[in-house]
Regions:
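Compositional signal for N-terminal targeting/processing segments
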Residues: 1-124
């Protein structure tokens, strides 16, 4: 089985067209799309009646909802086109990326670094 990697520009209409064209030409057995592995069970929703982009996956910590990660998809997103192709052609589809815990932890660390590096606006304001 040959492996093909299709480089994309996120939310690029030209990239979305090329991905769709390449998938139709290659007719792969398996497609991997950048996304959280924990959300794989949602991939079946792509072809659901009434599901129209723009849509997004949202992951957040229930105890700290402002610590969130978004995965937006538009009709002109190459990722959406790959997911739609897989859904309509019956091609095996999986998300691949680091588990969400790493993304959420990164967000938390960046927030801490930012707050240490520069005081908040309220901290600098005279109230």
């Amino acid at each position: 089985m040959a492996t093909y990697i299709l480089g994309v520009r996120h939310h690029g209409p030209g990239s979305a067209r090329r991905v769709r064209e390449r998938l139709e030409a290659l007719r792969p057995d398996l497609i991997l799309v950048e996304g959280p592995p924990e959300a794989e069970e949602l991939l079946g929703q792509v072809a659901r009646e009434g599901m129209k982009p723009p849509v997004a996956l949202l992951a957040y910590e229930p105890t700290n909802p402002q610590n969130a990660v978004f995965y937006p998809f538009a009709a002109f997103s190459p990722e959406w086109q790959a997911m739609l192709y897989a859904a309509t052609e019956g091609t095996e589809l999986h998300f691949f990326d680091l588990p969400l815990i790493y993304r959420l932890t990164q967000t938390e660390v960046k927030a801490e670094e930012t707050s240490e590096a520069s005081p908040s606006v309220i901290g600098r304001a005279h109230v």
